[in-house]
Amino acid sequence: MVPAPHTQHYSSSTMPNSSSTTAHSAPTTNGDVHAPKDHQLSSPSDTVPAPVNRKKQKRRQKQAARLAERQLANGHVSTDDATQNGSSHTNPERHHSDDGGADGPDHEQPANGDVYPKDGQDSTEAHIDSQNPQGPNGTESSQKSTGRKSKKKKGKKGRNGSHAQGDETSTPMSTPSVSMSHPLPPPLSSHLASHNILKPAKNRSIWNTSTQEERENIKTFWLELGEEERRQLVKVEKDAVLKKMKEQQRHSCSCTVCGRKRTAIEEELEVLYDAYYEELEQYANHNQGSFEKGSPMVPPPRLYQPPLRSPGQHTRTQGQFHPSRGRIHELTEDDDLEENYDEEEDDGDEPYSDEELDEEDEETRAARADFFAFGNSLTVKVADDLLKNDGKHFIDMMEQLAERRMQREEDTQYGIAAAHESLHSGHNHGPFDDEDYDDEEDEDYDSQEEEDYEEDEMDAMTEEQRMEEGRRMFQIFAARMFEQRVLTAYREKVAEQRQQKLIEELMEEETRNEQRNAKKAREAQKRKDKKRLQKQAKEEERARREAEKAAEEAAAKAEQEKKLEEQRKKREEQRKKKEAERKAQEEERARKEAEKLRRQREERERQAEAERKQREEKKRREEARRKEKEERELREKKAKEERDRKAQEQQAKKDTAKGGEEAKDQEKRDDQAKRSSQQVPVPIPTNLHHLQGLSPTVAHSPHVPSATPVLPKAPTPAKPRQPSQQDSHSSSPHSQAPSTDPSQASLSPRSMPVSQSSGVASGNSQQGQGLHAMLHQPQPSTPLSPLGRSIPPGFSSVNGIPPNPPGLSGMVARPPVGHDLPSYPSHSGPFISPFRGYPAPTGIPAPPGINGARPMPPGRGFPLEPAQGFAFHGQQIPGAFSTPQGGLPHRHSRQPSGSLERSPLENHAQPMPISRPSPIKRPSSTQQDQQKGDDRTTQRDVDDLSAHLGSSALLDDSDVSLSSNLSQSLPGATVPGTFSGPARASFGGPSLFPDPLSASGWSNNAFGSGGHHRAHTSRPVAIRLLVIQACKQLNTMSPSKGADGYHDVNLVLRHVEQLRPQNEPSISLKEMLDICDTEGNTQNGGGTFSIRKDETGEFVKFEPDNNSAASGHRGSIVPGEIGSPVPSSSLPAFGGIGTPSVLRQYSSPPMGF
């Protein structure tokens, strides 16, 4: 390993603190300052600071240094001199602490593993440390404090302790020799040597090596190099230095002085470099054997020889070149150097003032920044540091050597003590970089120059000392550069090893990663395989479950289908069973219908037989009546003759008794005859009952009755028949039984007596008798003639209501606005009703014939329209008091009424047995005899007319006399009801239209008035309407059986028969089917019939259309529905089938009066 001999020489010759340190300072070894013993004994003010003049203090130091040099020259070596000349202070404790505490608090291992010594290390450590000059970034590994003063004090305290310890333990190892024989460095301690050298290489790590290990490795590396390799390293350094110097000189001055400097520098450099290499060879050859044996390294003797001048000369020389070193310090531009060397300042500055301490610190930093940079960081190259700024550091050092050399020449020639001053004053070259200087350094330089001027007289440097000084400086620089190259080569080798090792480790790491990844991949594959197996097992399990589920579903489906099939079979059986039951029911129903039809046929046969017997009986009765009539005519003839005789007798008597009154009576009779001749002939009576007690003497004559001849009555056949305003049913005398009560008389006006000459007494008695008869008088059913009926004489008006206009005596005037209210009682008579429909206050109706009115039926609470069979009549107004009336004509004995309310013509009718009329009696002058005779005459006339006139004349002897025909639509009586149609033949209550024959234009109905309609309905239309109604009823009653709308024709026919009025002929199946084939229109109910034939029979279905009266029949009431009257033969005047309700909307156009 290359030794660092320059460390000792540099420490003793080039340290700036050798001339400017405190009293305690002495030559240093790698930063260790040792105070001489004599100075320590003579300086009791070590720790006591005292204000001392700075210049005086420096003189004392220089004087002490000169004394020490003299002692060295005389051969007396003190402890301090031995330390200065290379003797080492051995401190076992310190070696031990350095060895074992490489990583302790005083040592910080940098990135590359090198540890550098700090203050207090001995010369051996300094020697070893010189081979590892630089650390990373050129920084010291000690921790830095933040304050400048604290760093100084800390370093001074540490150095004081090390000085004391070194002084106590140091021993001089050898004496100096002028003949270049240098003392050897002290041997290393046994534990240090064994730890550093004999450590196995395999146990050493190339990554983390301690300072001692690295130093040993560097030594080993240098010793292993060959001659050529070593020369090549030196050659490279020499070429580099020369190249840099030449490049620098191109920019320098070209004057003679500068040229001499360049020449001197080149020559000096070549000589010194060659000499230094020779010394290195000598050292290497000398140290080869001892190194292998573990002996300590011995530096070359030449490098360790003491200086040839006194301490004073050394200090003076250093002071002369201090400004250049200051410039080098500025050019380093390394702030870490200042910080790292703050702690290595001398501790002798404490007794002095702060100004002196600052100046000395600046000097110390300047000196150490120049040549001690290699000891702080191994990564900063010394050559790069010195050659920075185009090698100004090295060039300045060479210039210093050249200046010294020139100074020596001038001193020998002129003997000038202050040669350096004249040199600088004569040659005024500025520095290479003026801005490198600062004010503080200028002050230091000025203070140094002043001190040097004061000491010029005392300092005298021999030429040999100056040569030695320059040689030593170059050796230090060359050694640094060389060591740096060796260190660089070593680092390259270590870097290569480390790179190789790193590659190997990376390969191993990669291999391990690959193995790890392969292992992970295998494990992942295993997990995947496991998951796949699990998934496969799950899939198999799911497939098995699905198969089981499918099998269960299939079984359940089969079971369900089986159940459905059973249910279907069961439903089919039930359907067949129901069908069989339905067929059985249909058969039973058909059987019942056939039985019913049979019974109906038998019933009709029985009825036909009974009618036949009745006709036979009728013929017998007619024959007997004819015979009786003949006999009666004979008796009447005889009686008439008798009456005529008696009348003539009475007349003769009257003529004699009353001569003057005969003309008046005759005139009255003529007026009465004239009035009777103006009336229409009396209609055929429908009831032969006569009113009891009524006689021509109802209106009593005020004259006394006398015997007057009776006028002959008009013959009965002369009475004309009503043309079309009376129904055959109401005009037939055979439907009513003749009355045998002698008290009942005809209402005909011809029954009125001609003579009215009864007395007052007899009038009073007859009045009471007539009143009794009126109380028991039945309502006559025979319609009275509308003409010829007027108020009798003396009854011009009733209650202020005017009489009828002339010629219309039968038309009773309507009441005024309050016509619906009963009139107030009239004072015209005790029993006379004020007018038609208004009963008297006593409840006794007026006699028939007066005003042409009919009394109000008892119990009626609302006014009724007049019977439709009467053309001229007045409105009926309910009375407050109604008295039951009896004796109304009875109805047909075979057909009872089915109406909602009895007709006013049939109220309180009592059936009476048919009997023969009373026998003909002789005419008498009494009322009863006259009445009886009139009854017989009227009966004969009616029977004769009944046999030859009306509908009876159209019938054959074998036919049954029916009440009406379907093709006829004759007006009939209005049945009390809720509604009334426009036609007088329709069924209902008060009409919306007034009576066109009435005297007033008012109607009982408040909705309006209008003309009348004449209903006209044919039998096919009526049958079709009944079939439509039957189909609708069947759809309503049995929607399930007739869901398709088809019904059995027999069933429909039965319903039609039920709806058919009883007075109409039966409808056959063929007739109904033929009528169903007709098209529907607005007259016959609309719609169409569909007939379907199959093996079970014929079925009919009604399909309505827009012409059909679907729901409401437009206000009409269909027979059989709620609110409709039950069809009956007692209402023959309604016009046949369907006239009361259905055909209201199909009535004929209105007819005028």
UniProtKB/Swiss-Prot annotation:
InterPro entries tied to this protein = Fungal_stress_NST1 (IPR051195), NST1 (IPR025279)
Compositional bias of kind Acidic residues: 332-363, 433-462
Compositional bias of kind Low complexity: 11-30, 64-73, 169-182, 721-739, 913-925
Q: Which domain of life is it from?
A: Eukaryota
Which portions of the chain have biased composition (kind: Basic residues)?
53-63, 146-160
- Keywords recorded for this protein, A-Z: Coiled coil, Cytoplasm, Stress response
Pfam families per the UniProt record, alphabetical:
NST1
Q: Where does this protein have compositionally biased stretches of type Basic and acidic residues?
A: 91-109, 116-128, 507-526, 536-674, 931-941
Major subcellular location class: cytoplasm
Q: Provide the Gene Ontology terms for cellular component.
A: cytoplasm
Q: Where is this region: Disordered?
A: 1-212, 288-364, 421-467, 507-941
Coiled coil region boundaries: 447-658
Compartments where located: Cytoplasm
Residue ranges under compositional bias (Polar residues)?
A: 76-90, 129-140, 312-321, 740-769
Record's family? Belongs to the NST1 family.
Functional note: May act as a negative regulator of salt tolerance.
Protein name in the entry: Stress response protein nst1
